[in-house]
């Protein structure tokens, strides 16, 4: 069972600055659309994971380090969408529902440079992973969740490949 980032078991863990440097992923050989940063250990693991992919396939990091303000905007926007879809929903319930897809700011790994949004690319562009990047559960009929069954066989295979190389490099694929 997935533990959501809004869960008390997560939110009560203290966040401590370790001093680990942030590095430009491009300088580590990672494909990015523009300058993206992550903690050095994350960048190193991504570089290793990239080497595990078959010839012609690469990791492509869409977003790494995210300013707190951007994370808050994403969270606020998604919560507003959920409130429109579920009139009368309690603040607590919208918080939990939103955390299936967007990390609450107080524990969001992106704001620490500890998470990346990524996909796989080949010679002709992005590989099929079943949904566009950032498709919400509502927009994708739940297909954005890693174990979704309403995606193509090709997308399932590509998701499994992505999870395998990330895991082999010591990274965790958050399944929501």
Regions found by a protein language model. Give the residues of each.
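Extracytoplasmic cell-surface/polysaccharide-interacting catalytic and binding patches
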Residues: 1-64, 68-175
